């Protein structure tokens, strides 16, 4: 008994010294109710929010969004930016590809007047800017578009044909080592958009891989595989894509869930389309033939008419979204009073 008391006293002394040296909360018991649940930033698609398990992208974590060209990667990221800004948050966009379209971003709901944008010359500059913004503690979300465009300084200053094996992978590994703890402490969500490449000589399994080495795969709490599966047409004219997203890694909820939603050209993710799909799937919206009804009221004949009706009646759309989230037990998304930095475990 005496030995046990001595151990407890020694532990208390050690914890007191650690708190004095490194600040209160440097070491804590997991059972201590000192931290709130993980907050989430909505993605703009109720189906994807449900697949992620917590109602959106987790705050204070590293997110990787990858897929083929024109699959909707940047669109998903910009919707998250728009939702973070709508809740009163501050957002930044590191445009390493020099391809950000402000007009399109504005149509998705991004407040382009207050969006912090950087178009860096080198990968080192891009990641240093991102690290400094995160460490300011004022940021809610930052997007790096894309990992493949983070070209090391040595490669830019060298000549065409020079070999620079592993430079980008080492750069990403170093940056993520520095940024991960800062992201958790500041409650900033970092979204890395990535491209696909094919490994040569793969006989079995998928030859696809992402750029930038393996560090991002390890540090990411959530990895989203975005694929275009169908073209949406109005008559013969293509008006959008049907998109499937697979949550291939998830540290905050069960992984390997999939979500499907519509991306309309010039308008981004169709929130109303996702509400109709999820509402029908879970019995909140009734589909009879081509007609969609909710609580006995007709929404429209055909999905496009029902979508237009919900777009014109946002209160009804919000009510349907709330019922879907309540039925599925999804945590509430980030609200305007919840954008302050929240320490989150890694």
From Swiss-Prot:
SMART domains assigned to the protein according to its UniProt record, in alphabetical order: AAA
User: What CDD domains does this protein's entry cite?
Assistant: RecA (cd00983)
Kindly list the GO CC terms recorded for this protein: cytosol
Which GO BP terms sit in this record?
DNA recombination; DNA repair; SOS response
A molecular function (GO) term: damaged DNA binding
- Quote the record's binding site residues for ATP: 67-74
| UniProtKB keywords | ATP-binding, Cytoplasm, DNA damage, DNA recombination, DNA repair, DNA-binding, Nucleotide-binding, SOS response
| Localization in the cell | Cytoplasm
Superkingdom of this protein's organism: Bacteria
* Keyword DNA damage in annotation: yes
Q: What does this protein do?
A: Can catalyze the hydrolysis of ATP in the presence of single-stranded DNA, the ATP-dependent uptake of single-stranded DNA by duplex DNA, and the ATP-dependent hybridization of homologous single-stranded DNAs. It interacts with LexA causing its activation and leading to its autocatalytic cleavage.
> PANTHER family recorded for this chain?
MITOCHONDRIAL DNA REPAIR PROTEIN RECA HOMOLOG-RELATED, RECA
Q: Please give the HAMAP family that the UniProt record associates with this protein.
A: RecA (MF_00268)
Which family, according to UniProt?
A: Belongs to the RecA family.
Q: What is this protein called?
A: Protein RecA
């Amino acid at each position: 008994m005496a030995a046990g008391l001595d151990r407890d006293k020694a532990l208390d002394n050690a914890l007191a010294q650690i708190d004095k040296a490194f600040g209160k909360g440097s070491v804590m018991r997991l059972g201590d109710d000192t931290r709130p649940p993980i907050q989430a930033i909505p993605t703009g698609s109720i189906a994807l929010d449900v697949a992620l398990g917590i109602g959106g992208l987790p705050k204070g974590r590293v997110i990787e969004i990858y897929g083929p060209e024109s699959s909707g990667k940047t669109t998903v990221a910009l919707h998250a930016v728009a939702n973070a800004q709508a809740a009163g948050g501050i957002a930044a966009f590191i445009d390493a590809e020099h391809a950000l379209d402000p007009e399109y971003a504005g149509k998705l709901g991004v407040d382009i007047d207050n969006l912090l944008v950087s178009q860096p010359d080198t990968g080192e500059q891009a990641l240093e800017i991102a690290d400094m913004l995160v460490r300011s503690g004022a940021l809610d979300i930052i997007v790096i578009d894309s990992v493949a465009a983070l070209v090391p300084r040595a490669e830019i200053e060298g000549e065409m044909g020079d070999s620079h094996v592993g430079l980008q992978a080492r750069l990403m590994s170093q940056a993520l080592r520095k940024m991960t703890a800062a992201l958790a402490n500041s409650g900033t969500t970092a979204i890395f958009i990535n491209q696909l490449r094919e490994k040569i000589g793969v006989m079995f399994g998928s030859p696809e891989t992402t750029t930038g080495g393996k560090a991002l795969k390890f540090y990411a709490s959530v990895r989203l595989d975005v694929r275009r599966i169908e073209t949406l047409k109005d008559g013969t004219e293509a008006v959008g894509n049907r998109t499937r997203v697979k949550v291939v890694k998830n540290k905050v909820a069960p992984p390997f869930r999939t979500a499907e939603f519509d991306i309309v050209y010039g308008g981004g993710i169709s929130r109303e389309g996702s509400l109709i799909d999820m509402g029908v799937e879970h019995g909140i919206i009734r589909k009879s033939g081509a007609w969609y009804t909710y609580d006995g009221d007709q929404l429209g004949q055909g999905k496009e008419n029902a979508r237009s009706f919900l777009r014109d009646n946002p209160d009804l759309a919000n009510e349907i979204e709330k019922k879907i989230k309540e039925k599925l037990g999804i945590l509430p998304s980030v609200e305007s009073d919840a954008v302050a930095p929240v320490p989150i475990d890694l």
